[in-house]
Amino acid sequence: MVNEFDKLKAGKLLLASANMLESSFKRTVLVVCEHNERGSLAFILNRPMEFKVCEAVSGFEEVEERLHMGGPVEVDTVHFLHSRGDLIDGSLEILPGIFWGGDKNELSYLLNTGVMMPSEIRFFLGYAGWSAGQLEAEFEEGAWYTAEASKDIIFSDAYERMWGRTVRSKGGEYQIVANSPELPGLN
């Protein structure tokens, strides 16, 4: 499989390779929100947490959606992706129709008044981050693949199947990878 680092940019998906054994990233699907010469930042899409936004984030008492573990960095910070950049100041478009961040007070108002629906947003605790050169080195070691992101993937609740489906969608030899057992040695 080829090194896909050159394809990486904001709005792409990072897929943990089948041989990624680090528990924080094993079989994860991440969306890249920032990628430049200083490093990269992404959020894990398929690690929902057991508690809800309303239980952990002040100002969002009406939001019954689950929080997601965005990554192992700064796990005391809250981040969000959404589809309403037209309504939330300070949003950064990472791919057409998908935005990162923005004014949390505006977001709270829009959600609490029903102008914006919880299905249009995903909340994360923490993020995945890499310093300059770190992610490139991990690509060279075969730790990651890339894939195209879409609104359907980013807001999907099919957490258990997300990694396999996304890897499989790359076609070819990736279909075999997607069907491999998590612990081949135990097979």
Curated annotation (Swiss-Prot):
Please indicate which superkingdom the organism of origin belongs to: Bacteria
SUPFAM superfamilies reported in the protein's UniProt record:
VC0467-like (SSF143456)
Q: Which Gene3D superfamilies match?
A: VC0467-like
Give the family, as the similarity comment puts it.
Belongs to the UPF0301 (AlgH) family.
Protein name, as recorded: UPF0301 protein Ppha_2142
Q: Which GO terms describe its cellular component?
A: cytosol
Supply the source organism for this entry.
Pelodictyon phaeoclathratiforme (strain DSM 5477 / BU-1)
UniProt-listed InterPro entries: AlgH-like (IPR003774)
